[in-house]
Amino acid sequence: MGRGKVELKRIENKINRQVTFAKRRNGLLKKAYELSILCEAEVALIIFSNRGKLYEFCSTSSMSDTLERYHRCSYGDLETGQSSKDSQNNYQEYMKLKARVEVLQQSQRHILGEDLGQLNTKDLEQLERQLDSSLRLIRSRRTQNMLDQLSDLQQKEQSLLEINRSLKTKLEENSVAHWHITGEQNVQFRQQPAQSEGFFQPLQCNTNIVPNRYNVAPLDSIEPSTQNATGILPGWML
């Protein structure tokens, strides 16, 4: 008689639950080890208890290498599919932008007066209305720019006038101050008293002749000597 089907549900008894966890955990780790040895398979087993304790087994030397390989196998196909889908979306977006660029280039040629032969009367009238509207906008913008420039020039003119008035006021103030200083100096010069005549002492000449210490005889009392000491007359008397 075969074994009946066992209903799987949470074990309510805490001790029984811990015992069952230990037995099943050890059995699972043993099966993983046997599978890696018997079948030469790369096996990685990770178990967390209800308390958060970690139990693990890895048939290779590095659990990280096995997990990285698992990540490449599991998510590589998804990334490839997503990349292919993104490429398709990018190509469709490129085609839309390309068509829009061609339309804009053709419209630009029509505005410049090129390739008008393929346009009918209705298209030409529409193009004319577009050009008229563009001209009105251009003229309006040009007028606004001129008004702005005029306003700027008026402001600069007003600023220069203010500077000119300020400089003129300063110049007048400096002139008045200089005039006052010069006037005060002239008044002080006129009010200064003249020098009295007694300041200069006249030189007094002494008319009394100082008598010479040598007694000089008058000229008419001197008798000319016609002979020298030797008694010989000079040559001019001969």
UniProtKB/Swiss-Prot annotation:
Domain MADS-box, residue spans: 1-61
Signal peptide as annotated in the record: none
Keywords linked to the UniProt accession: DNA-binding, Nucleus, Transcription, Transcription regulation
Pfam families the UniProt entry points to: K-box (PF01486), SRF-TF (PF00319)
One term of GO molecular function: DNA-binding transcription factor activity, RNA polymerase II-specific
Recorded GO CC terms: nucleus
Main subcellular location: nucleus
Matches recorded under SMART domains: MADS (SM00432)
Keyword Magnesium assigned: no
Domain K-box: 87-177
Gene3D superfamilies: Transcription factor, MADS-box
Keyword DNA-binding: yes
InterPro entries attached to this UniProt entry: MADS-box/MEF2_TF, MEF2-like_N, TF_Kbox, TF_MADSbox, TF_MADSbox_sf
Subcellular location as annotated: Nucleus
A biological process from GO: regulation of transcription by RNA polymerase II
Function comment: Probable MADS-box transcription factor that functions with J2 and EJ2 in meristem maturation.
Name assigned to this protein: MADS-box protein 04g005320
